[in-house]
UniProtKB/Swiss-Prot annotation:
Its EC number is 2.7.4.25. One of its GO terms (cellular component) is cytoplasm. It comes from Brucella melitensis biotype 1 (strain ATCC 23456 / CCUG 17765 / NCTC 10094 / 16M). It is found in: Cytoplasm. This is Cytidylate kinase. ATP binds at residues 15-23. InterPro entries: Cytidylate_kin, Cytidylate_kinase_dom, P-loop_NTPase. Belongs to the cytidylate kinase family. Type 1 subfamily. It catalyses: CMP + ATP = CDP + ADP; dCMP + ATP = dCDP + ADP. GO terms for biological process: pyrimidine nucleotide metabolic process. Keywords: ATP-binding, Cytoplasm, Kinase, Nucleotide-binding, Transferase. Pfam families: Cytidylate_kin. One of its GO terms (molecular function) is dCMP kinase activity.
Length: 219
């Protein structure tokens, strides 16, 4: 009897900051009972490890060591969501050696499981280019800034909308123009513009695509 290995069913959700990809990824993971990895947290976790030890953020060797020893299952989103950690993460995320180490860890996470949902910026193009289904979630900068602004207020913190919008545009430019793994949709990704969509509408649109991919995957 011929045996064969079924490839893991990987759902990829890429997109710029505050596009709604994380919210959508968590909803999809819950609906299908799939493990979820927010790959953006891996860069934040590396930055936090350096900050906690009082180490410089511009030392690629130290940052890479932190990346190689990272436990993906021990990341605390609530702690890692702090603004200061996000700022620090943007500095280590541009380091090629750090990116290579984290990409390998993210890839291992996806390939070691029967199914999973990963969201980030380069999952469909770099981490899991052979994923069964790829979504690229986007929205206008103004809509994304409003979402981020509302998130900050909901946490009880203060925020300046104009400052958030400027930061988002700056991050978009940095992400799209970086030499290593620039932010762009994979050629076979399904584009999902959530500028005028509710979370429920975005989920239903994604679910339709995923259900179709699942049916094909199962043959």
């Amino acid at each position: 009897m011929k045996s064969f290995v079924v490839a893991p069913f990987i759902v990829v959700i890429d997109g710029p900051a505050a596009s709604g990809k994380g919210t959508l990824a968590r909803r999809i993971a819950t609906h299908y009972g799939m493990p979820h990895l927010d790959t953006g947290l891996t860069y934040r976790a590396v930055a936090k490890a350096l900050l906690d030890k009082g180490l410089p953020l511009d030392d690629e060797a130290l940052a890479t060591d932190a990346a190689l020893s990272l436990d993906l299952l021990a990341m605390d989103k609530a702690v890692l969501s702090a603004h200061a950690i996000g700022e620090a993460a943007s500095k280590v995320a541009v380091m090629p050696a750090v990116r290579r180490a984290l990409v390998e860890a993210q890839r291992h996470f996806a390939n070691a499981l029967p199914s999973s949902v990963l969201d980030g910026r380069d999952i469909g193009t770099v981490v899991c280019p052979d994923a069964a289904i790829k979504l690229f979630v986007t929205a206008s900068p103004e809509v994304r800034a409003r979402r981020r602004f509302d998130e900050v207020l909901a946490r009880g913190d203060t925020a300046d909308f104009a400052e958030i919008l400027a930061d988002l545009k700056k991050r978009d430019e940095r992400d799209m123009n970086r030499t290593d793994s620039p932010l762009r949709p994979a050629e076979d990704a399904h584009l999902l513009d959530t500028s005028e969509m509710s979370i429920e509408a975005a989920f239903l649109a994604a679910k339709k695509l995923i259900d179709h991919a699942l049916a094909q995957h199962r043959g």
